[in-house]
Structure formats: structure tokens, C-alpha cells
Amino acid sequence: MHSNPKRLNLLQGIALIISSTLMLGVRAQELPLVDADTISPHPFPAFTPNGSVYQPGESLSYTFQFGLIHAAQADISVTEVSPSQHGPSWEILVEGRTTGAFKWIFKVEDVYRSTIDAASGLPLHFHRDIHEGGYELRQDYAFDWTRNTVHSHRKKGDQDSVIATYLLPQTSHDMVSALYALRNVKWDQIQQGDTTGIPLFMDEEWFELKLVHQGIKSIKMDGKKYECIVIQPVIQTGRIWKKSNDLVVYVTNDSSHIPLYAETRILFGKIRMELTHAEGLRIPNSFGH
């Protein structure tokens, strides 16, 4: 029995957009890996740590809708781990999976784990284990900020492992720590229409993820109204997206900056991400406690 290429592309696209929407892992501008002469201590001052708005014990849950179909679910939790040589550390765990009838059509089980320095928010270790249909990938990164390097171990399916070491700017993030670094940004100090950026290391490449502040907007979820900051990642067009502004993320316009809702138009429809549960918030708001 032959599979339908069109359907397979659709399902692979949904798996990709679920991952991309949640992680904000979308390439804005790919750049070559930097050499030591180009590294500066804080190339992106907006992301210099200014006091964390999250804490161990926080957990967030999201659902993903493709049209009227409940396609997937993701859970994020923050826990305290044993202190390392760097001092107190936190682990951010992200687990995503397709749900309901959709998982029988295209099964997705993804795990992302980032261990970060509690003081700076910078990543120390990153683990990614994804299973999407017949595609499997495992990645492990070890960050060494005394040398501004990341040691990468990548294994795809049954292929041999690829091990390499890369130079990075000091404030680089993995795809999970980047999501939480965004929450610590003082968005009230960034003007509507302005663009900020964060250096991101993903898939053995370093690039700058650009984000446009699109202003303040109120949205309604489950009969409640929430005031949100609208953030637009500048995404790469082509395989999934038609336009570079086809992904919009809404974060709460309070001190927590929780990603509340995201919407993206792709080549074959629209996908929505909604926060369904929040607890253990460091700064309680109208959604969580």
C-alpha cells in the first residue's frame, strides 16, 4: 500500500509547526558560526538577565488545534536540580505529543530538556529526543561558557552519531532556554514596531531569532479577556509558511509574560496554540495561581 505524499507532507508540516510554535524555533536569519574574534560579552543587551519571572514548581499546559481538530498537547515544567559546579540550576522540561485520533494517523512524541543556570538563565545542558512518524532524532548539547563553546552530540535514526564543538556568543540559548529568556525581557521598554533579537543555537547552527513588538491587544479565551503583548517572530518562508509574518504569539501583558496564545497560517491551513492550565506561577495572575 502506497502512502499519499500530499497527506504525508501535511502531517509532517503539522508536526513541524507544533514544535516551531511552541519553541519559537524559527530561523530568522541564518549566520555562519562565529569565530573567537567576533564574540562580545553581551551582543543582545535586551536579553541580559534582570531577575527571573518564573520559578521551580511552575507548570504550563497547551493544546494545539488544526482547524476544528484537537491535534496535540504540550506540557512544560520547571524544577530545581542538584547544584552543579556553576551553582544552583533549574531544569525546564517540555513534552509534546499528538492526541486523540490524530495520534493514530501521525504519532508525535517529543521531549526537550534544558538545564539552565538559575542566576543567568543561560543553558548548561540541552537534550532533545523527537519521534515524529518514522523520523527519530536525538541531540545533546553541553555548553561551556568559560570557553564560549557548545559540544554537540547528534544522532538521527540508525545513522552514526555526529560529534562536534562550536564557538558561540556568550548569551546564546538553546530552543527551550530561549523561550524562557523571552519571558524575562522588559517588553515595556521596547517600542511597538521595534525588532529585538536573541542568539539561538539549534540543529548545529547559530543564528539570530528576530522578534517584532506588534503592540498590545486584548484577546478572549474561555469567556475571559486578557491583555497581551503581540510578538511576531520573523520566520523563514518556503516549505511551511507563505509569509515571514505568518506566526503571531500573544504573551500576557503582566510581569509573568506567559505565552497565552499563538496562531499561524501555513500553506495548508491554520494552527492555534492555547494555554489551558497554569500553576506554580511566581507572579500570580488571572490565569494561574
Residue spans for each PLM region:
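Sec/Tat signal peptide C-region and signal peptidase I cleavage site
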Residues: 24-28
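Bacterial N-terminal signal peptides
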Residues: 12-22
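Hydrophobic, well-structured mid-protein blocks that either form specific transmembrane helices
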Residues: 139-179, 183
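Acidic, serine/threonine-rich low-complexity disordered tracts
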Residues: 30-145, 184-289
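N-terminal acidic, proline/glycine-rich, low-complexity intrinsically disordered segments
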Residues: 2, 29-30
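Bacterial N-terminal signal peptides that target proteins for export
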Residues: 2-14
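Compositionally biased regions
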Residues: 4-5, 20-21, 53
